[in-house]
Regions:
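Mobile-element integrase/transposase regions
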Residues: 1-32, 40-44, 178-195
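Active-site beta-loop-alpha junctions of metal-dependent nucleic acid enzymes
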Residues: 34-62, 83
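Acidic/histidine-rich, metal-coordinating catalytic segments
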Residues: 59-78
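RNase H-like two-metal-ion nuclease catalytic core shared by retroviral integrases
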Residues: 65, 76-77, 97-119, 135
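Two-metal-ion acidic nuclease core segments, chiefly of the RNase H-like superfamily
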Residues: 79-97
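Active-site-proximal acidic segments at structured loop/helix or strand boundaries
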Residues: 115-214
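Conserved small/polar residues in nucleotide/adenosyl-binding loops
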Residues: 227-229
Length: 229
């Protein structure tokens, strides 16, 4: 499976804003998966991979990506060292992370073509949506529609070949890995916790207590031991 980030501009609730479509494409069937996020951060990257695996119905043997900092700790290409969270994710799902060499777009040409396809077919003219969920529903609809397409030099439609390709995918683990980014702030005197540059209010009775904050792409959860605040 090849994966990559794109960039797009939309109107969200009447306001013009930039979003980041995550694109994934299987190599045999050319089946696409696309989901948009506000940011290209680690939480979004791992959440998108989880959703792509679920959408395709199995785990590919390899995930081919570039040398973006969300995935690579050091080095590049064959010498790249994966970020700890990404390495843990790959181990959980049982795939090999493969990193492209610099300036070698041909190594993930399938997904780069998908980025362009989404830009031309979904983002022109600029989409007007009320929420990111509405945009992602449109993206999934486009992915489903593409399965009726037949790629040049392929013997069958994308959907038919995806059915065949699923037989070669690994089974999805029964346990879904928690891909949130963790923080461990103490509740301050004003009953707030600080996560990066943001403050979040909690009930006054939790002042001085240690919490676990789980940051997901579009929301956070604050936990005190096993209690979800």
């Amino acid at each position: 499976m090849q994966v990559d980030w794109g960039e797009a501009v939309i109107y969200l609730g009447g306001q013009r804003m930039a979003v980041n479509p995550f694109c994934a494409r299987l190599c045999f069937s050319c089946a696409p998966f696309v989901i948009a996020y506000e940011r290209q951060n680690l939480e979004s990257f791992l959440d998108a991979l989880t959703r792509a695996i679920q959408f395709f119905g199995g785990v590919p043997r390899q995930v081919i990506f570039d040398n973006a900092r969300v995935a690579v700790k050091s080095g590049f290409g064959a010498h790249a060292v994966a970020q700890e969270d990404y390495a843990q994710f790959a181990a959980h799902y049982g795939f090999e992370p493969v990193f492209c060499n610099p300036a070698s777009g041909n190594e993930k040409g399938l997904v780069e073509n998908l980025v362009g396809y989404i830009r031309r077919n979904v983002c022109v003219p600029l989409p007007r949506v009320r929420s990111l969920e509405e945009l992602n529903a449109k993206l999934l609809e486009q992915c489903a529609k593409y399965q009726t397409h037949r790629v040049d030099n392929k013997p069958a439609s994308v959907g038919e070949m995806l059915t065949e390709e699923r037989q070669a995918l690994h089974a999805i683990p029964r346990y879904t890995l928690d891909t949130s980014k963790k923080f461990y702030p103490t509740v301050g005197r004003y009953a707030t916790v600080i996560v990066e540059t943001n403050q979040y209010s909690v009930p006054c009775g939790y002042r001085g207590q240690s919490t676990t904050v789980k940051a997901y792409p579009n929301h956070i959860e604050i936990w005190l031991s096993l209690i979800h605040i």
